[in-house]
């Protein structure tokens, strides 16, 4: 059954108006990509470390320990995230050399620390460690949400608490 001409005209007019108006309104952009979560950020960094030749790397979070023996944290964050590069085959192997190269790049470590504190809402300190050694690089959150590398203090081991961002000569590098 064929619709009368007035109905065809009405439908065609409505379709024309819809087409006209659809083109005149800007499309609403979907919201930007959500910030990657803490776990996704850490996983990405661990994968990047592996891609640089490190065979094994692990991480752990020490909840609520950032202010232990320290004073002056400019934030309310309290967690320490440790990234451990495992050197179980020796410093002269390709794995050991890859670890040494990473630790020789404070800008790279600082970049990773900044990514972690940006996406891990309660992380105040990011520590990079070489397993089976005393070698670590520690990055402390600042008021602006970025991190700075730990500075070596001249304080002795009995000085408690240690000012934020300072480390004892034994542990800082």
Residue ranges and their predicted role:
Residues 2-14:
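Bacterial N-terminal signal peptides that target proteins for export
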Residues 10, 31-38, 98, 102-105:
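Intrinsic-disorder-associated interaction segments
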Residues 25-67:
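N-terminal leader/targeting segments
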Residues 12-22:
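Bacterial N-terminal signal peptides
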Residues 50-96, 120-173:
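Polar/charged, Gly/Pro-rich intrinsically disordered segments
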Residues 97-122:
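Short, non-transmembrane amphipathic alpha-helical segments
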Residues 29-33, 115, 147, 167:
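Disulfide-bonded cysteine motifs in exported proteins
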């Amino acid at each position: 059954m064929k619709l009368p001409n007035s109905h065809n005209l009405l439908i065609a007019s409505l379709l024309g108006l819809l087409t006209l108006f659809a083109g005149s309104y800007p499309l609403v952009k979907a919201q930007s990509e959500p910030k990657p979560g803490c776990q996704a950020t850490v996983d990405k960094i661990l994968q990047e470390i592996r891609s640089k030749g490190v065979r094994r790397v692990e991480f752990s979070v020490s909840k609520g320990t950032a202010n232990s023996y320290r004073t002056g944290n400019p934030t309310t964050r309290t967690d320490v995230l440790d990234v451990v590069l495992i050197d179980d085959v020796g410093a002269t192997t390709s794995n050991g050399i890859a670890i040494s190269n990473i630790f020789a790049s404070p800008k790279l470590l600082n970049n990773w620390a900044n990514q972690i504190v940006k996406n891990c809402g309660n992380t105040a300190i990011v520590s990079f460690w070489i397993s089976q050694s005393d070698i670590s690089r520690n990055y402390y959150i600042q008021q602006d949400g970025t991190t700075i590398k730990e500075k070596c203090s001249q304080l002795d081991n009995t000085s408690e608490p240690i000012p934020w961002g300072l480390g004892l000569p034994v542990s800082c590098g």
